[in-house]
A protein has these predicted regions:
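Short, solvent-exposed helix-loop connector elements
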Residues: 47-55
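C-terminal catalytic domains of large/alpha subunits in multi-subunit enzymes
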Residues: 33-34, 46
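Non-catalytic, structured segments within soluble enzyme domains
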Residues: 38-42
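Feature 926 captures the class I aminoacyl-tRNA synthetase adenylation module centered on the KMSKS loop
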Residues: 3-30, 54-469
Length: 469
């Protein structure tokens, strides 16, 4: 039998029967019995168990991520009512993210079995948290639209089944650790889509992995793609560019092997980052501009008192003129500088480089390459950003009004900012599609609105109103 030596307070103090203590019944009532069990399970047996309500809240937040996967599935399953009783997924129809999640679930299942056999439940808890994060912040995030789009029912069913396999496996694996939460999910998730399942999660055999799936290195490809997304997101944050603001180009400087790995996820990368194009480059110099400066050591004898005048001339040259001069200097030709009568030897100039305007970059881990963003915003990109900001605010007011996800609505958007209204008029069909809106009033309001709200979009106030269609 393995057990922890003692339970101590979260700040390291010892509990006492006559002094500071937390009664189990009180803790179970306040943070839940499963949370208490989860805290204990997550502590290595070689250490004392630290226990307290702050740690309990942290553990509960981690369990909430698992719960939210169930909530997401349940929300859309209420509409579509998927049933897997006699369902066999078409593996050839699976997307790369589908294959990744099945392979990732098999991997989690294998690790969980080994850790249970080794009595290393605390390591299982950590693996579970990583697995839940993978499902939430990669699979669901990149496949959300598949669960509510209409038309391709086969693809939607595949997405349901893959998510079911992952969530069901996690529920079975974690049932000894968090028995009450897993039982609730079993009854309200597994037995709804697979009615012939055992009547309790605690009466099940150990789950079996899905065999016969060609992964083709999908786990590594996914890891590289996620790193590119995370790095580019960090660059966005540093430049204070919201994800809803589209950008023109993502540059990835890498070798051909890395480029091939992420090729299958190009669309997902661009969608996640809200960027129009991805360009692969083999040298970061592509992201730099060359320009000339005066080589003072040599130029002094030639230009004498006109050295600073030449410096000022170079600083005011157009981009085209500078490009021509740089090319001439690099070839060692004599150089004619606009505004000057004489030609000059190439050695009185120095070729320098600087990052192109609007380009920001960062290196990937382990020398895998460099990621760069073009942050220059054109009028079209700015208008599209206004539209996406407006759609986001409208989605929030829909939710605040308490509508079901499938509810058709009427929406009104009123603003004194003509730039906002002008941008919205160009994208009315897109806006209606995103909001499930049968009617969209721009520049007016609704007489029967269920909820009206004023929000900030762009540089001004926008008044939103929503009603059921």
């Amino acid at each position: 039998v393995l057990t922890n030596s003692a339970v101590i307070a979260e700040d390291g103090r010892k509990f006492s029967k006559t002094g500071f203590m937390i009664k189990f019944d009180e803790a179970a009532e306040k943070i839940g019995a499963d949370t208490v069990r989860y805290l204990y399970a997550g502590a290595p047996v070689s250490n004392d168990v630290r226990f307290g309500y702050n740690l309990g809240d942290e553990a509960r937040r981690k369990l909430l991520s698992y719960w939210n996967i169930f909530t997401f599935f349940e929300t859309y399953a209420k509409i579509d009512k998927p049933n897997f009783e006699n369902y066999t997924p078409d593996k050839s129809a699976m997307t790369p993210t589908d294959i990744w999640l099945v392979v990732r679930t098999n991997e989690f299942l294998k690790k969980a079995k080994a850790l249970y056999d080794d009595y290393k439940v605390y390591m299982l808890v950590k693996e579970f948290e990583v697995f839940v994060d993978d499902i939430s912040n990669w699979y669901i995030r990149t496949n959300r639209r598949r669960f509510w789009k209409t038309g391709d029912e086969k693809d939607k069913m595949t997405a349901y089944w893959v998510l079911y396999y992952a969530l069901n496996t996690a529920t079975l694996v974690m049932s000894p650790v968090i028995p009450f939460m897993t039982e609730h999910i079993w009854q309200n998730f597994t037995r709804k889509v697979m009615p012939s399942s055992p009547i309790s999660v605690h009466l099940c055999d150990w789950p079996k992995p899905i065999e016969g799936l060609e992964d083709d290195g999908i786990v590594e490809k996914t890891a590289v793609s996620r790193e590119i997304i995370a790095t580019a997101m960090r660059l966005r944050n540093e430049q204070q560019l919201k994800v809803r603001q589209p950008l023109s180009t993502l540059y990835v400087c890498c070798d051909s092997e890395t480029a091939n790995k992420i090729g299958v996820f190009e669309k997902i990368i661009l969608d996640e980052l809200n960027i129009k194009n991805i360009k692969y480059i083999d040298d970061v110099n592509v992201l730099e501009d060359k320009y000339l400066t005066v080589n003072f050591k040599v130029a002094g004898a030639v230009l004498k008192q006109n050295v600073n005048k030449m410096k000022q001339t170079l600083e005011t040259l157009s981009k085209d003129d500078m490009t021509k001069l740089v090319s001439a200097v690099e070839q060692g030709d004599e150089v004619y500088v606009p505004g000057w009568d004489d030609k000059f030897a190439a050695d009185i100039f120095s070729v320098q480089t600087k990052t192109k305007k609007g380009i920001v970059s960062a290196e990937l881990q382990n020398d895998k390459g460099v990621v760069a963003l073009d942050t220059v915003l054109t009028d079209e990109l700015i208008k599209e950003g206004l539209v996406r900001d407006t759609v986001r605010q409208c989605q929030l007011i829909r939710k605040e009004a308490g509508y079901e996800v499938e509810q058709r609505v009427k929406m009104a958007i009123e603003s004194l900012d003509t730039a906002v209204i002008g941008a919205l008029k160009e994208k009315t069909e897109y806006i209606k599609s995103e909001l499930l809106a049968d009617e969209l009033v721009l520049g007016g309001t609704l007489s029967d609105a269920d909820l009206t709200k004023e929000v900030e979009i762009g540089d001004g106030k926008v008044k939103l109103a929503v009603a059921k269609a």
